[in-house]
Amino acid sequence: MAILEVKGVSKYFGGLAALDNVNLTIQEGEIRGIIGPNGAGKTTLFNVISGVYRPTSGQIFYMGETRIDGLASSKIAGMGIIRTFQRTALYHDFTVLRNVTVARHLHARENIFGVFAGTVKKLEEENLKRALEIVEFMGLGRLKNELASNLPHGHQRALGVAIALACEPKVLLLDEPLTGMTPTEKSRMIDLIRKVHQQGITILMVEHDMRSVMELCHYISVLDFGRLLVEGLPVEIQNNEAVISAYLGTEDISSLGGEKVAT
């Protein structure tokens, strides 16, 4: 079943086409890689899907029939499409647990039924319980009382994903989740992404680390100059001449076949 469909979406800034007639069909339960050279339109695509930007033209459908292009980002998030950002948005003066609890509170505020279904105290207890579960799930349990500002970069990125999970995503948009990480941090995050996916969450991932993309993703869409260049399985993308040409001068992805990410 298609959980997300992007149909003929374009986004212009002045006379510049950041996205040009992009069509994507994301199947429920997949991990989809969105790759391309710098300036290809990857983050703009995420911004359009998540409601940060309205598309200039085209349509986006969620769960088959619900059209979401043009909806407010808070509305889209409340429907279960949650994104992370290249620069993790944290409350740096809050603890790890408090960051996740606040995200739970904000999510519950969008759920009117939840507000009326129980007392405020009960909701607070449920939010705290769920926040603790998420913190443990993301491997941050021993750091739950640590200030976010004191965390190493890799743990801050993990906390960013934990905050996203607090909003109960059905579709999770990960914008460069591995950027700036050491090899050890990267391996840890890759394992966490797999764990998140095993919870039944569909994942779209923008990432420049091609080895990790080839290892993690079931299917890959390649953007170049705002257009969808090609789609395919990882092995197909590795050997596609158009993709290799687009990446010349950055990284030769044809050399990545068969390599595994260290765990």
Question: What are the residue ranges of the model-derived segments?
Answer:
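Glycine-rich phosphate-binding loops of nucleotide-dependent enzymes
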Residues: 1-263
